[in-house]
Curated annotation (Swiss-Prot):
Belongs to the IPP transferase family. This is tRNA dimethylallyltransferase. Residues 34-37 are annotated as: Interaction with substrate tRNA. PANTHER family: TRNA DIMETHYLALLYLTRANSFERASE (PTHR11088:SF60). ATP binds at G9, A10, T11, A12, T13, G14, K15, S16. Transmembrane segments: none annotated. It is an enzyme of class 2 (transferase). Monomer. InterPro entries: Dimethylallyltransferase, IPT, P-loop_NTPase. The gene is miaA. Its EC number is 2.5.1.75. The record marks T98 as: Interaction with substrate tRNA. One of its GO terms (biological process) is tRNA modification.
Length: 302
């Protein structure tokens, strides 16, 4: 019987290292739930598991897309559900900090299968967010009530789905939860300690060659590549352009990562099914191992 263990939480809480240790004990595999680790060549800045780590335990949904491709939540859900159904190992580990990816699996979100429409998006974006939101209120008032008036990304997506399918996105959404047992484990620590973790990790990324990685990606794909405008890459890109110093790029990365971690914590805390553990507890691995044994034994006996 399939069982799934989710390891989630904010960035820099140690999810990957914990998952690796657990997977080795369990003889299991790791399915990534990180929206940037799916892209090839984006390695250091995404804290992607190293080649050596990936040799220790099979990792899935890492390095599956070119940086010029687009991986939607619907794509991720489809591939992950197929993996869970086909991999002959249990329990499986789903690990990452991309909340929508995790939610798409554990809650079985129904997601409209509408690929990004570049020309349509361009036409809509030219109208401005104020007009777009007014249009959404007319064609899909239910979705408009759930989307903030300044949320241009979700407004655009809702209109895109409506104009492609002729049906409001609110009527195409819902949930179809999986029928297998799921244990959701969250890692967290206090703000000051998380800030120190983020600082140390940022410094390590730079020491590991983040500047050279960004320089290579800019040369190969062009500085306008959308992924290069994401956390950790956009700041180094500013440094390479001569706009800021490397120290300033580092401090900006730390600041932006802390802000991102705050948003992640808010997202995950909204889900009561997640069982929280202190990432700085020296007995963390043993405590979670005990909880996993309870989970696997309970679901096996039932």
């Amino acid at each position: 019987m399939t069982k799934l263990i989710v390891i989630c939480g904010a960035t820099a809480t140690g999810k990957s290292s914990l998952a690796l240790a657990l997977a080795m004990r369990l003889g299991s595999v790791i399915i990534s739930a990180d929206s940037r680790q799916v892209y090839r060549k984006f390695d250091i800045g995404t804290a992607k598991p190293t080649v050596a780590e990936q040799k220790l335990v099979p990792h899935y949904l890492i390095d599956i897309c070119d940086p010029t491709d687009t991986m939607t939540v619907a794509d991720y859900q489809e591939q992950t559900q197929a993996l869970i159904a086909s991999v002959d190992v249990t329990p499986l580990l789903l690990v990452g900090g991309t909340g929508l990816y995790i939610r798409s699996i554990v809650q079985g979100m129904k997601i409209p299968r509408v690929a990004p429409q570049i020309e349509l998006r361009s036409q809509l974006e030219s109208l401005g967010q104020l007009q777009l939101y007014a249009m959404l209120q007319q064609v899909d008032p239910v979705a408009a009530q759930k989307i903030h008036a300044n949320d241009s990304v979700r407004t655009l997506r809702a209109l895109e789905v409506y104009y492609v399918t002729g049906c409001p996105i609110s009527e195409q959404q819902g949930e179809n939860p999986p029928n297998y047992p799921i244990l959701q484990i969250g890692l967290d620590c206090d703000v000051e300690k998380l800030g120190n973790r983020i600082k140390q990790r940022t410094e390590q990324m730079i020491a590991d060659g983040l500047v050279a990685e960004v320089e290579y990606l800019c040369q190969k794909y062009g500085a306008d590549l959308s992924l290069l405008n994401t956390l950790g890459y956009q700041e180094i890109k500013q440094y390479l352009a001569g706009d800021i110093s490397l120290d300033e790029a580092k401090e900006l990365t730390i600041l932006h990562t802390r802000q991102f971690a705050k948003r992640q914590r808010t997202w995950f805390r909204a889900y009561p099914q997640i069982e929280w553990f202190d990432a700085n507890n020296p007995d963390l691995l043993d405590k979670i191992w005990l909880r996993i044994n309870e989970f696997t034994n309970c679901t096996h006996s039932s």
